[in-house]
Structures are given as structure tokens and as C-alpha cells.
């Protein structure tokens, strides 16, 4: 489990592609390396991956075909930067919202506005997910816990604001229009919406 509070963005230094699998290595800080071990879970651009190797200040991960097809990791290359967060432990503060690292799909950046002291980004996703996205609700994008500000369900878009600290610590500081990000719907919201739908359908069947 993760909190959606990214601990920094770090550079990919190696990508090894094999049939249905890639192994990639990221150069990280001493703070990230501390207490990490082979088998640890790490959020990498929002995707929960297992550390396969630690060597000096570098950590390696394997990403399988399902992950490559569903997330942006399928297009990963050397010099890319990734948002990294170590998993939280029992008793740790959840500064954002509970994030599992199980990606539902990708969202595209369709607009960026930069009014004074603000960074406003609009995303577009598959409309099937829009029933779970509400103003003031949580969403995880590339592993970052964010609060939705505005929603256009007809267009399949939603808007979020980024504070300067989030931009400083994440890859969103240099992402542009047309870029794709990994999206994880808030599980609590999804459970509530699906439960209500089941109840309503049950009432309809009973009539």
C-alpha cells in the first residue's frame, strides 16, 4: 500500500527488453535506498512493482506483459524519469489517500493552464471510468495522490490543480499536452458506486 505522496522523481539508466518482459534500472537517492531490500514493493509511476535487484544507488524492477500493455511502462526508455514512492508501513501517516498501485488505465493530458502561482491540468480518460470520478474526490495519477477539481463526464475529462511542492518532487513539472499518465481510481469511491448500482438494479428486478 502507498500514500500517493511521491518521494522524488529519478532517472532510468538501463532498460533490457525481452519477450513479454522488460527489466529496468533506476538511479535513486540514499533516502530511497534506505531500508529497501530485494522483494520490497515500490510505486513506480503509480505501478506497484517488486524490487528485483539493488546495486549501489540503483534499483531494478521487472515489468510483465500485462503491466506493459496497461501502463505507460511499455514505452519506457533510458533517461526517462519516474515518480518513486516506497510502500508505507503500519502506523505511517497517509498524507494523500490509500493507493494500491494497481492501475486501471491511462489518461491523456489535454490541456495545461498556468495562471499566476497555479498549475492546472485537464486529463481525458476512457469514459467507463468517469462514473467513479467526482469533484473533490481522490485520484492517483502516475502515483501522485490528487484531488479532482472539475469533471466533464460528457467529454470524459477531469481537472486537477498542482501545488508547487508536488511539481518540485514529481514528473508533472515537465509533462506536456498529449502525454499519458497511469491512472488509479480511488478504491473506496469505486466500491460505493458499484454497491449503489447493485442495490438499484436489485430494486428494479424486484418490481
Show where each model-derived region lies.
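Conserved loop->alpha-helix
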Residues: 1-207
Amino acid at each position: 500500500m502507498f500514500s500517493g505522496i511521491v518521494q522524488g522523481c529519478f532517472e532510468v539508466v538501463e532498460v533490457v527488453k525481452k519477450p513479454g518482459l522488460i527489466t529496468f534500472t533506476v538511479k535513486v537517492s540514499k533516502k530511497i535506498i534506505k531500508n529497501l531490500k530485494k522483494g520490497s514493493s515500490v510505486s513506480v509511476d503509480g505501478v506497484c512493482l517488486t524490487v528485483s535487484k539493488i546495486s549501489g544507488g540503483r534499483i531494478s524492477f521487472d515489468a510483465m506483459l500485462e503491466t506493459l500493455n496497461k501502463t505507460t511502462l511499455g514505452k519506457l526508455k533510458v533517461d526517462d524519469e519516474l515518480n518513486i514512492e516506497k510502500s508505507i508501513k503500519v502506523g505511517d501517516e497517509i498524507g494523500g489517500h490509500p493507493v494500491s498501485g494497481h492501475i486501471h488505465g491511462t489518461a491523456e493530458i489535454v490541456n495545461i493552464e498556468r495562471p499566476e502561482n497555479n498549475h492546472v491540468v485537464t486529463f481525458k480518460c476512457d469514459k467507463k471510468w468517469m462514473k467513479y470520478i467526482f469533484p473533490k474526490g481522490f485520484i492517483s495519477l502516475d502515483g501522485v495522490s490528487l484531488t479532482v477539481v472539475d469533471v466533464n463526464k460528457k467529454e470524459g475529462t477531469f481537472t486537477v490543480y498542482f501545488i508547487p511542492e508536488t511539481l518540485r518532487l514529481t514528473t508533472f513539472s515537465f509533462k506536456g499536452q498529449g502525454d499519458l499518465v497511469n491512472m488509479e481510481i480511488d478504491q473506496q469511491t469505486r466500491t460505493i458506486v458499484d454497491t449503489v448500482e447493485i442495490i438499484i438494479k436489485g430494486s428494479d428486478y424486484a418490481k
